[in-house]
Regions:
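Catalytic nucleotidyltransferase
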Residues: 2-11, 105-159
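Active-site-proximal "nucleotidyltransferase
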Residues: 1-120
């Protein structure tokens, strides 16, 4: 990997990518190839108008908590497999979101461009969890327009 430093991330050692050129390449790959940006919203705020619709039609709901929203992007860069947590917000004064490389073991095929959308949470015992809310991309195939049952079924297969 390029310019960066090792940090403690979710209680483990991880690599914080600082190279803005590499960050731009990663974000451009997601945007140009798959139309995925960190500004994409995957949720609706529950209110009195849409609650009636939800009551009348079957739905699967997930609740947004106080965790931090991240994509988990599994990809190959320069022939090496990477698991990249991409923060879905950009801190003030920065041009790019934080991108953290972690070591996760998945089947090799999943590293052919897979993107999970989820939330990092710490429980009351100080354990970190990544709650997957959605599957946006699987092995280079867009899952944005598939129904949630298909997406979650694929997530269970992957895990």
């Amino acid at each position: 990997m390029s310019k960066g430093n090792y940090i403690s991330f979710c209680g483990k050692r991880a690599f914080n990518i600082l190279d803005e050129t590499l960050k731009q390449e990663i974000l451009t790959k997601l945007h140009k190839n798959y139309y995925i940006t960190i500004k994409d919203k995957n949720f609706y705020i529950l209110n009195s108008k849409n609650i009636k619709y939800i009551e009348k039609n079957p739905h699967i709901l997930s609740v947004k908590s106080i965790g931090s929203l991240y994509y988990l992007f599994l990809t190959i860069i320069d022939g090496r497999k990477y698991s990249l947590f991409i923060d879905k917000k950009i801190k003030e004064g920065h041009k790019f979101p934080r991108i953290i490389s972690v070591i996760y073991r998945f089947d090799d095929s999943v590293f052919n461009d897979t993107v999970f959308d989820g939330e990092l949470l710490r429980d009351e015992d100080d354990n970190w969890l990544y709650i997957i809310n959605n599957l946006l991309l699987y092995q280079g195939e867009l899952y944005k327009n598939k129904n949630i049952v298909q997406k979650l079924g694929k997530v269970y297969q992957i895990l």
